[in-house]
Regions:
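Domain-core detector
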Residues: 1-208, 214-225
Length: 225
């Protein structure tokens, strides 16, 4: 069973999000594998698709643990490796490719991963203490996959700022239920970049937040003639 787990983990980690896109530095836009420009919505769906795959893999690891097919150490190691790969990949998309990633960017991802690993350690302690039922454990592990979206948004905001965007607007997902915090952020309309927290931050939705952000450049003031 350990060999099966290792093979499955390798397959998950080898599924790279950046195999489906490239970033055009000149236009500041993404292209698909055929060279066609991708919309912002398409890029976000690409991230969501990868997160869904990560969540499925984390749930599978957790079911294997519940069924006694793997040990707690094996489960924790597989979860850590999956989260590490997914957060790095999401950040790379957010920053517009590996060329946009420097030591500072990798440092921010490292800090984020340390926080996630600390949460995971508490999760492990709860499992050891038999404080979680199987449904509770499966629901909780899903939140770790959803947290990957935050690494994308962190990178995207920095990239947009570097490209001269100075305004932002929170956009609600019409298909999702939003908390009062997110409704309040969206109601503020277009504001200065950095005024609003990124999706998943400072809101009751947390990692499940389905908001997006759109960025705008400040239009120069016109003087009437």
């Amino acid at each position: 069973m350990l060999n099966d787990l290792a093979a499955f983990t390798e397959a998950v980690l080898s599924s790279r999000m950046d195999a489906e896109w490239s970033y055009d530095q000149k236009s500041g836009r993404f292209r698909d594998e055929k060279g066609r420009f991708l919309s912002k919505e398409a890029v976000e769906k690409l991230v969501d698709k990868r997160i869904d795959k990560v969540e499925a893999s984390l749930r599978r690891y957790t079911r294997m643990l519940i069924d006694g097919a793997i040990t707690l150490d094996q489960w924790q190691g597989s979860v850590r490796e999956s989260l590490k790969a997914a957060h790095i990949q999401a950040a790379i998309i957010g920053h517009g490719g590996r060329a946009g990633m420097g030591s500072a960017e990798y440092g921010r991802i490292g800090q984020r991963l340390r926080e996630e690993y600390a949460y995971l350690q508490r999760f492990t302690s709860d499992l050891l203490g038999n404080r979680l039922s199987a449904p509770m454990a499966l629901a909780r592990i899903g939140l770790y996959a959803q947290s990957v979206r935050g690494s994308y948004w962190q990178g995207a905001e920095l990239r947009q700022q570097q490209q001269g965007y100075s305004l932002m607007r929170r956009i609600l997902d019409s298909q999702a239920q939003h908390c009062q915090d997110c409704l309040r952020y969206a109601a503020q309309g277009i504001v200065s970049l950095g005024t609003l927290p990124l999706p998943g931050q400072r809101c009751e939705c947390g990692a499940r937040c389905r908001c997006t952000v759109r960025y705008f450049r400040q239009q120069p003031a016109t003087v009437p003639v």
